[in-house]
């Protein structure tokens, strides 16, 4: 099982990724984790990545793809792998294809933006303990106060509505085009690569976590 998980920030990809990797016994491939591990290990690719990072520059797609290929050689990828958060752009997807990275499924978790804004902007947390609440789905007993200590709850900057909207705008511009890219490849094939076209699956990300999990498993049969 080799798959890519697509969906907007706040669509629930991380939660479903955990279920999928446990069910199929495959690792979740995170480019951030790969970069940190390669830098820490001092591999040639890691040292090259460190030069970019130390200079405050984005690591090139070519270097990321080389790291991906290196990571996929590890024994834990023998039965497959799950990409969550990569590729983010068409050039990255194209580079993966040209590098011969095989994908069986692309699974999109579809959630309307209005719902994502409600989900993310409603989060509240107690800074000292890490306890989390949601003004709509899991409210504290007393509005704005932690259940245990009675101390004020905070809203993280990442969860503020204007920040959420900006993240969704970036997704719309950079990552959403991947939906069309993979849909077209799945439907029409691509003679420029020997790779077999992946199957494209779209599921609704609305409902309970368990309902979405069952939809995901059904889509990957």
Curated annotation (Swiss-Prot):
<feature type="binding site">
    <location>
        <position position="92"/>
    </location>
    <ligand>
        <name>AMP</name>
    </ligand>
</feature>
<dbReference type="GO" id="GO:0004017">
    <property type="term" value="F:adenylate kinase activity"/>
</dbReference>
<dbReference type="Pfam" id="PF00406">
    <property type="entry name" value="ADK"/>
</dbReference>
<comment type="pathway">
    <text>Purine metabolism; AMP biosynthesis via salvage pathway; AMP from ADP: step 1/1.</text>
</comment>
<feature type="binding site">
    <location>
        <begin position="132"/>
        <end position="133"/>
    </location>
    <ligand>
        <name>ATP</name>
    </ligand>
</feature>
<dbReference type="Pfam" id="PF05191">
    <property type="entry name" value="ADK_lid"/>
</dbReference>
<feature type="binding site">
    <location>
        <position position="167"/>
    </location>
    <ligand>
        <name>AMP</name>
    </ligand>
</feature>
<protein>
    <recommendedName>
        <fullName>Adenylate kinase</fullName>
        <ecNumber>2.7.4.3</ecNumber>
    </recommendedName>
</protein>
<feature type="binding site">
    <location>
        <position position="31"/>
    </location>
    <ligand>
        <name>AMP</name>
    </ligand>
</feature>
<dbReference type="InterPro" id="IPR000850">
    <property type="entry name" value="Adenylat/UMP-CMP_kin"/>
</dbReference>
<feature type="binding site">
    <location>
        <position position="36"/>
    </location>
    <ligand>
        <name>AMP</name>
    </ligand>
</feature>
<dbReference type="InterPro" id="IPR007862">
    <property type="entry name" value="Adenylate_kinase_lid-dom"/>
</dbReference>
<dbReference type="GO" id="GO:0044209">
    <property type="term" value="P:AMP salvage"/>
</dbReference>
<keyword id="KW-0545">Nucleotide biosynthesis</keyword>
<dbReference type="InterPro" id="IPR006259">
    <property type="entry name" value="Adenyl_kin_sub"/>
</dbReference>
<feature type="binding site">
    <location>
        <begin position="10"/>
        <end position="15"/>
    </location>
    <ligand>
        <name>ATP</name>
    </ligand>
</feature>
<keyword id="KW-0418">Kinase</keyword>
<keyword id="KW-0808">Transferase</keyword>
<keyword id="KW-0963">Cytoplasm</keyword>
<dbReference type="InterPro" id="IPR027417">
    <property type="entry name" value="P-loop_NTPase"/>
</dbReference>
<dbReference type="GO" id="GO:0005737">
    <property type="term" value="C:cytoplasm"/>
</dbReference>
<feature type="region of interest" description="LID">
    <location>
        <begin position="122"/>
        <end position="159"/>
    </location>
</feature>
<dbReference type="InterPro" id="IPR033690">
    <property type="entry name" value="Adenylat_kinase_CS"/>
</dbReference>
<feature type="binding site">
    <location>
        <position position="207"/>
    </location>
    <ligand>
        <name>ATP</name>
    </ligand>
</feature>
<feature type="binding site">
    <location>
        <position position="123"/>
    </location>
    <ligand>
        <name>ATP</name>
    </ligand>
</feature>
<feature type="region of interest" description="NMP">
    <location>
        <begin position="30"/>
        <end position="59"/>
    </location>
</feature>
<feature type="binding site">
    <location>
        <begin position="57"/>
        <end position="59"/>
    </location>
    <ligand>
        <name>AMP</name>
    </ligand>
</feature>
<comment type="subunit">
    <text>Monomer.</text>
</comment>
<comment type="similarity">
    <text>Belongs to the adenylate kinase family.</text>
</comment>
<dbReference type="GO" id="GO:0005524">
    <property type="term" value="F:ATP binding"/>
</dbReference>
<keyword id="KW-0067">ATP-binding</keyword>
<feature type="binding site">
    <location>
        <begin position="85"/>
        <end position="88"/>
    </location>
    <ligand>
        <name>AMP</name>
    </ligand>
</feature>
<keyword id="KW-0547">Nucleotide-binding</keyword>
<comment type="function">
    <text>Catalyzes the reversible transfer of the terminal phosphate group between ATP and AMP. Plays an important role in cellular energy homeostasis and in adenine nucleotide metabolism.</text>
</comment>
<feature type="binding site">
    <location>
        <position position="156"/>
    </location>
    <ligand>
        <name>AMP</name>
    </ligand>
</feature>
């Amino acid at each position: 099982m080799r798959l890519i998980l697509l969906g907007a920030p706040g669509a629930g990809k991380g939660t479903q990724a955990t279920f999928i990797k446990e069910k199929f016994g495959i690792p979740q491939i995170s480019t951030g984790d790969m970069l940190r591990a390669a830098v820490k290990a001092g591999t040639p690719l890691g040292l090259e990545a460190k030069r970019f990072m130390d200079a405050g520059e984005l690591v090139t797609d070519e270097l990321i793809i080389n790291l991906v290929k290196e990571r996929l050689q590890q024994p834990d990828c023998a039965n497959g792998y799950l990409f969550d958060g990569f590729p983010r752009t068409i050039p990255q997807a194209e580079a993966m294809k040209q590098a011969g990275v095989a994908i069986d499924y692309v699974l999109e978790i579809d959630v309307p933006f209005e719902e994502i804004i409600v989900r993310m902007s409603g989060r509240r947390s107690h800074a000292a303990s890490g306890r989390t609440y949601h003004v709509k789905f899991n409210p504290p007993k007393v509005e704005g106060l932690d259940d245990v200590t009675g101390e004020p709850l905070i809203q993280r900057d990442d969860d503020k509505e204007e920040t959420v909207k900006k993240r969704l705008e970036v997704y719309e511009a950079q990552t959403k085009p991947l939906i069309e890219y993979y849909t077209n490849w799945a439907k029409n094939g691509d003679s420029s690569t020997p790779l077999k076209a992946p199957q494209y699956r779209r599921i609704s990300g609305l409902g309970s976590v368990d309902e979405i999990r069952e939809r995901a498993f059904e889509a990957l049969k």
